[in-house]
Swiss-Prot record:
The gene is RNASE9. One of its GO terms (biological process) is defense response to Gram-positive bacterium. Gene3D superfamilies: Ribonuclease A-like domain. It comes from the Eukaryota. InterPro entries: RNaseA (IPR001427), RNaseA-like_dom_sf (IPR036816), RNaseA_domain (IPR023412). This is Inactive ribonuclease-like protein 9. Keywords: Disulfide bond, Glycoprotein, Secreted, Signal. It comes from Symphalangus syndactylus (Siamang). One of its GO terms (cellular component) is extracellular region. Does not exhibit any ribonuclease activity. Residues 1-26 form the signal peptide. Disulfide bonds join C97-C152, C115-C167, C122-C129. Belongs to the pancreatic ribonuclease family. One of its GO terms (molecular function) is nucleic acid binding.
Length: 204
């Protein structure tokens, strides 16, 4: 039977065999869907993280607004706040749960202005951070279960304190923009003081 097929239809069978023996090739994914700008950027970021093997893109203004800033709604002291918001905002790193995360109840312009405040030591004491001048309400999320999405489980902690952030220069905007939220330090735990030159210092 096989010999008969090869004799009668040699060319189609050879072409089919050639296609089957070719290595699998991934085609470029068309992302030109009818999305809003926020959703389009979020979808492109998802595809980049899924296919990329290198470092992720630096955060943009829209990414910071989407992942960090929150509006009044669910009570900030709700026990499930982090589990709800982290899933809703797709907060993860290369499909793995983030070890910790901060949500801040403030406007983006207020957060960006912190980039121009004085430097203070970061939480780990290694880098320099910028500190907010006033107290900010927010939620600290700490990973308690699982390492891969969507099984991430977090413990939620309401905080009202000083925000410590790192900032990065963005060429497109020609401005410093928030890069990471390093800590949200409550005054009662802060034991802060000003050094002789007026710089805010966090004791070890």
């Amino acid at each position: 039977m096989m010999r008969t097929l090869i004799t009668i239809h040699p060319l189609p069978l050879l072409l089919l065999l050639q296609q089957l023996l070719q290595p699998v090739q991934f085609q470029e994914v068309d992302t030109d869907f009818d999305f809003s700008e926020d959703k389009k950027e979020e979808f492109e970021e998802y595809l980049e993280q899924f296919f990329s093997t290198g470092p992720t893109r630096p955060p943009t203004k829209e990414k910071v607004k989407r992942r960090v800033l929150i509006e009044p709604g669910m009570p900030l002291n709700h026990i499930e706040y982090c589990n709800h918001e982290i899933m809703g905002k797709n907060v993860y790193y290369k499909h793995r749960c983030v070890a910790e995360h901060y949500f801040l109840l403030m406007q983006y312009d207020e957060l960006q202005n912190i980039c121009y405040n004085r430097f203070v030591p970061c939480k780990n004491g290694i880098r320099k951070c910028n500190r907010s001048k006033g107290l900010v309400e927010g939620v600290y999320c700490n990973l308690t279960e699982a390492f891969e999405i969507p099984a991430c489980k977090y413990e939620s902690f309401y905080r009202k304190g000083y925000v410590l952030i790192t900032c990065a220069w963005q060429n497109e905007l020609q401005k410093l923009i928030p890069h990471t939220i390093n800590d949200l330090v409550e005054p009662s735990e802060h034991r802060s003081f000003l050094s002789e030159d007026g710089v805010f210092v966090i004791p070890p």
